Regions:
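Conserved acidic residues
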Residues: 55, 105, 135
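Short glycine-rich phosphate-binding loop at a beta-alpha junction
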Residues: 52-63, 138-139
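Short, well-ordered alpha-helices that flank and scaffold nucleotide-derived cofactor binding pockets
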Residues: 47, 69, 73, 125, ...
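Active-site-facing substrate-recognition patch
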Residues: 1-52
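Short, glycine/charge-rich flexible loops or terminal/linker lids adjacent to PRPP-binding catalytic cores
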Residues: 65-108, 115-121
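PRPP-dependent phosphoribosyltransferase catalytic core
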Residues: 2-6, 125-168
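Short loop/turn motifs at secondary-structure junctions
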Residues: 53, 77-78, 131-133
Length: 168
């Protein structure tokens, strides 16, 4: 949590991807792509997912990309990672999900930080359309999305809340 407070929390007026305005921004890419933060994120998210049986972790690009990869590495090869594109490619194999095939597999959708739940729920929809069984959503920081994700019938767990970071 200290790396998040030190590297990721930026104070100042910002517009979030949800369109909402806020007095601070949590830029977790500063942690997930950091030489010390990335490996730690993988271990922490695997702990968050304890008790869930799953084969792969991934989510909507870009925030989820390093999170899924960190979990893959921290698992010692026990799980795969996947990336959900915002839109299907118009060339090549025209895939929406990159990485190992998720069809018939139990997956966890991950996200670095979520305010409204829109990104993880978009990834859930894409994973299900590709034939995956989504068993839950795991967030590094729940900025308020947990209730929306649970209302969609999914279990949602987070490593940290705004209160944990002293932001609530």
């Amino acid at each position: 949590m200290s790396l998040i407070k030190e590297l990721a929390v930026v104070h100042g007026r910002v517009v979030l991807s949800s369109g909402q305005e806020a007095d601070y921004y949590i830029d977790l890419r500063r942690v997930t792509l950091h030489r010390h933060g990335g490996p730690l994120v993988g271990r922490v998210l695997l702990d968050v997912c304890a008790g869930w049986s799953f084969d792969a972790a991934g989510g909507l690009t870009l925030g989820a990309d390093p999170v899924g990869a960190a979990m893959l590495h921290a698992s010692g090869g026990a799980i795969d990672s996947f990336v959900v594109r915002k839109a299907e490619k118009k060339h090549g194999m025209q895939r929406r999900i990159e990485g190992p095939d998720v069809a018939g597999r139990r997956v966890v959708v991950v996200e670095d930080v979520s305010t409204t739940g829109a990104s993880p729920l978009t990834a859930v929809e894409a994973a299900r359309a590709a034939g995956a069984e989504v068993i839950g959503v795991a967030l590094i920081v729940d900025r308020g999305a947990g209730d929306t994700i649970r209302a969609a019938g999914l279990e949602c767990r987070a490593a940290y809340t705004l209160a944990d970071l002293g932001l609530a």
